[in-house]
């Protein structure tokens, strides 16, 4: 035995020898240090976490093993239970509690954060905390929880942080060392399974690099054969452009990337399966499987198909027969039996977990996945395929970063199974091999803190430690640590700007030169002109809104903008004066609601008599009515469309005065004015940049503490906190807020304390709770205005009250210079209401598209949002001051947790 007796015992039980980085990290841990381990996916970081479990059990103390996802917690609980036995290992994931008093408990990070704020007795005897996937602290929504835990754990707890490879590991380790004491940073960039990079051009596979050429310099060169082939391919395309083509014929020489079945067949022939193909859209993943099913592609033997069917039946046996067709079960099953599957967050969890089990077992050979698979789920492959090097980030298509490329291709190569892993990029004419080489060669994935105070965090810190200690804690965050370091670069930027300003000023005749005065005056005129144009646009929009609200049934109007331009008749007046959207039928037979974006606000050009009921969805009715509209308008004088000037009749005395000063300025008629003005404008631009940098320096210094004080100010104003700023006290309402963990925590607390959600039936409560958790996918976070399609009047009233509370809260936030909370979103209200009432999945999913948006709700999203509603309902059940509301929340939970929502709750 050596001095590291426990490490010797631990390794003696392992079926493999420790790698060097694992040995170093475990040795540091036994010597009493905390550790930060940064290593590639699949390198074996979790061995270090498991050694912390071993040390805790050997010492008779406790270890908490935290993960960011419930699925990961379930997986780790299964692994540890198999090794140490059911009595030694517990599981806490918010909606699941198994043996919570065990010496080793696996949990989501949020559960541990909540324990810390509640001073839970379970923290007694805690010696180790393993934080798996600690790089999640960069996540905008959930990342702050990791820092809250690291900062607030008792000093004698050793933290084991396990992270993917990040380029600023030393900075991250330096921060942990500062706040946690002795911490050993272990960085290992060596992949246990070498990764080979390839490019698939048509049906030919090329190595991306020629490693023989670059070995001497240590940096491989792009494969010349690949470059030559692509050059020939592009030349063939150019020649094809010049070829005459018969009508209707294609372009025989034009390059088309291989189809998905062809790619999978090629990988199969090359012995490169199993493979994960990353497709950056859910619909694309499903379409890929459908394309493969339409081809002769089959990747499984008869024996494998029997095993696959057994797993499917075991995993999905609890699903109701009536739901199977709605879920696309039969096509999904057929894909699995042929060794093919999609994997994305829109899938039912039971389906997704079945795919993971079958792929890990080597039974499913080709998976088409979104990038979410690269985060956390243990599902390595022999090969990773990238169809594109750009992805949609919710707003626009952006190129993959080197960090994203590394994370995605990191799935290639299964330790202990594959000798090497493979990354394949599908070539398109817009892709340059050098671009792929740059992504593959760069290891830039810096960890950036997302830490920021929330209302719940603020109230808990005030309650536990008071404002002064809270300031000190916030000043120790990784966010502040990075901000303080960034100030150095900002100050250098200011100094560089000042030097350039001095040089330009010397050229122009000093910092008070007449040309600079003239340039400032010209900039002011431009600013005032822009402000006047904005005011004019707002005035026109308001005029259009007022005119829309005044329209009555039968009015004939002219739609002035957009594709629907021309005559229209009003079928139904607007319901909402604040956002009027009357229903109209155009002369081109289109029926729908228009907004101020379609209408300039001109008065109706006439009117016509309409039938009592107009079935505008029927083509025949639309045709006849459009004909009647044209006849009614035949004798009317239709005013010609005219362009409204930007100024819109506004008169701004300051603008007129500034223009006059500009014309009279001595420099105005100087020779060579434009050359001088260019330099002067450059001076003003650098001056503005410097002012912005100075504001950033001021904001970076103690920025979190100042934000915290603004939160305290707002909470004091709303009576969640009482007393002077130096000695605040949390009120009863504040204690209510302290128990709400939600992005909309303060709004929920306001709804509970004001009684906005009282008197509701269970399905109605589920509906209004969904409005504060749901966020429309790909939208602006707001659903349609609460209208007549809300299921019940009482629910509509509760939604309206919630919306009003949100509006006043957002106004207060703006007054306190706090980023406004997002508004309620009613996009899931009808869905959850119908599910709660009926348990009918088809009816619930159909309710998602009641407004005809054409964007169906996927089953996986449905389950995910149901579970978020369940989580908040559970908090309402525990925190609401009204006993009747607590009971209603409990019944609502029972109504939601059934069918597909209850199946496979991991």
UniProtKB/Swiss-Prot annotation:
Q: What class of enzyme is it?
A: hydrolase
Q: Does the keyword Disulfide bond apply?
A: no
Q: Where is the Helicase ATP-binding domain?
A: 26-184
| GO CC term (a single one) | peptidoglycan-based cell wall
Binding of ATP occurs at: 39-46
- Work out whether the entry's keyword set contains Hydrolase: yes
Know the name of this protein? Probable helicase HelY
Specify one Pfam family.
Answer: DEAD
The entry assigns this protein to a family as follows: Belongs to the helicase family. SKI2 subfamily.
Disulfide topology: none
Domain called Helicase C-terminal: residue spans:
259-463
């Amino acid at each position: 035995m050596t001095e590291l007796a426990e490490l010797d015992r631990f390794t003696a039980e392992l079926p493999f020898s420790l790698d060097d980085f694992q040995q170093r990290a475990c040795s540091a841990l036994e010597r009493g240090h905390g550790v930060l381990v940064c290593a590639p996916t699949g390198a074996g970081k979790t061995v270090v976490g498991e050694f912390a479990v071993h040390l805790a059990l050997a010492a008779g103390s406790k270890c908490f093993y935290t993960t960011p996802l419930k699925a990961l917690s379930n997986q780790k609980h299964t692994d540890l239970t198999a090794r140490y036995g059911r009595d030694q290992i517990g599981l806490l994931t918010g909606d699941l509690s198994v043996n919570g008093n065990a010496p080793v408990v696996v949990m989501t990070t949020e559960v541990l954060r909540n324990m810390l704020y509640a001073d839970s007795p379970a923290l007694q005897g805690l010696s180790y905390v393993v934080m798996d996937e600690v790089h999640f602290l960069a996540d905008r929504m959930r990342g702050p929880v990791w820092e809250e835990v690291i900062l607030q754990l008792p000093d004698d707890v050793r933290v084991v942080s396990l992270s993917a490879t990040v380029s600023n590991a030393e900075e991250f380790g330096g921060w942990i060392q500062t706040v946690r004491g002795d911490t050993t940073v272990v960085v290992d960039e060596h992949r246990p399974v070498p990764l080979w990079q390839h490019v698939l051009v048509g049906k030919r596979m090329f190595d991306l690099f020629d490693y023989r050429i670059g070995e001497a310099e240590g940096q491989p060169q792009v494969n010349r054969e690949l470059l030559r082939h692509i050059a020939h391919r592009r030349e063939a395309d150019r020649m094809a452009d010049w070829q005459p083509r018969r009508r209707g014929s294609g372009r025989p020489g034009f390059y088309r990337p291989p189809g998905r079945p062809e790619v999978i067949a090629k990988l199969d022939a090359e012995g490169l399966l199993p493979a994960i193909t990353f497709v950056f859209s859910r619909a694309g993943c499903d379409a890929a499987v459908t394309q493969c099913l339409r081809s002769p592609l089959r990747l499984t033997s008869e024996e494998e198909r029997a095993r696959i069917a057994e797993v499917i039946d075991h995993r999905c046996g609890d699903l109701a027969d009536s739901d199977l067709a709605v879920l696309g079960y039969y096509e999904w099953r057929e894909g699995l039996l042929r060794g093919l599957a999609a994997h994305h967050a829109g899938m039912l969890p039971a389906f997704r977990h079945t795919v993971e089990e079958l792929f890990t077992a080597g039974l499913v050979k080709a998976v088409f996945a979104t990038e979410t698979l690269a985060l956390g789920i243990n599902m390595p492959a022999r090969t990773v395929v990238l169809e594109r090097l750009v992805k949609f980030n919710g707003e626009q298509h952006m190129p993959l970063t080197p960090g994203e490329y590394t994370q995605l291709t990191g799935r290639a190569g299964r330790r202990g199974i594959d000798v090497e892993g493979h990354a394949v990029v599908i070539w398109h004419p817009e892709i340059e091999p050098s671009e792929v080489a740059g992504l593959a060669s760069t290891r830039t994935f810096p960890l950036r803190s997302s830490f920021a105070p929330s209302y719940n965090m603020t109230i808990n810190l005030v309650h536990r430690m008071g404002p002064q200690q809270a300031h000190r804690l916030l000043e120790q965050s990784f966010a502040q640590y990075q901000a303080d370091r960034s100030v150095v670069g900002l100050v250098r930027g200011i100094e560089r700007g000042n030097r350039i300003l001095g040089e330009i000023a010397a050229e122009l005749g000093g910092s008070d030169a007449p040309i600079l005065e003239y340039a400032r005056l010209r900039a002011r005129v431009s600013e005032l002109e822009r402000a006047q144009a904005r005011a004019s646009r707002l005035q026109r929009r308001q005029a259009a809104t007022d005119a829309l609200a005044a329209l009555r049934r039968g009015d004939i109007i002219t739609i002035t903008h957009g594709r629907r331009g021309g005559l229209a008749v009003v079928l139904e007046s607007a319901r909402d004066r604040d956002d009027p959207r009357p229903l109209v039928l155009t002369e081109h037979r289109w029926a729908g609601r228009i907004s101020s974006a379609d209408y300039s606000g001109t008065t109706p050009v006439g009117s016509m008599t309409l039938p009592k009921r107009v079935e505008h969805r029927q083509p025949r009715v639309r045709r006849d009515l459009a004909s009647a509209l044209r006849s009614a308008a035949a004798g009317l004088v239709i005013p010609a469309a005219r362009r409204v000037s930007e100024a819109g009749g506004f008169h701004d005395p300051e603008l007129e005065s500034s223009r006059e000063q500009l014309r009279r300025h001595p420099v105005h008629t100087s020779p060579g004015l434009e050359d001088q003005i260019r330099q002067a404008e450059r001076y003003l631009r650098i001056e503005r940049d410097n002012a912005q940098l100075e504001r950033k320096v001021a904001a970076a210094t103690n920025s979190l503490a100042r934000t915290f004080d603004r939160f305290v100010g707002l909470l004091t104003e709303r009576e969640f906190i009482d007393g002077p700023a130096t000695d605040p006290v949390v009120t009863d309402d504040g204690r209510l807020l302290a128990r709400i963990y939600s992005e909309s925590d303060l709004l929920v607390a306001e709804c509970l304390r004001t009684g906005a959600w009282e008197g509701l039936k269970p399905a109605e409560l589920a509906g209004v709770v969904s409005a504060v958790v749901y966020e429309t996918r790909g939208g602006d976070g707001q659903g349609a205005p609460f209208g007549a399609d809300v299921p019940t009047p009482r629910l509509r009233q509760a939604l309206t009250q919630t919306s009003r509370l949100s509006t006043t809260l957002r106004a207060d936030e703006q007054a306190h210079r706090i980023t406004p909370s997002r508004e309620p979103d009613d996009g899931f209200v009808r869905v959850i209401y119908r599910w709660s009432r009926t348990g009918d999945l088809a009816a619930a999913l159909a309710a998602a598209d009641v407004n005809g948006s054409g964007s169906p709700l996927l089953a996986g999203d449905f389950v995910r949002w149901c579970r978020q509603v369940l989580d908040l309902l559970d908090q309402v059940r525990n925190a609401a001051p009204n006993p009747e509301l607590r009971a209603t929340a409990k019944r609502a939970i029972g109504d939601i947790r059934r069918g597909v929502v209850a199946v496979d709750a991991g």
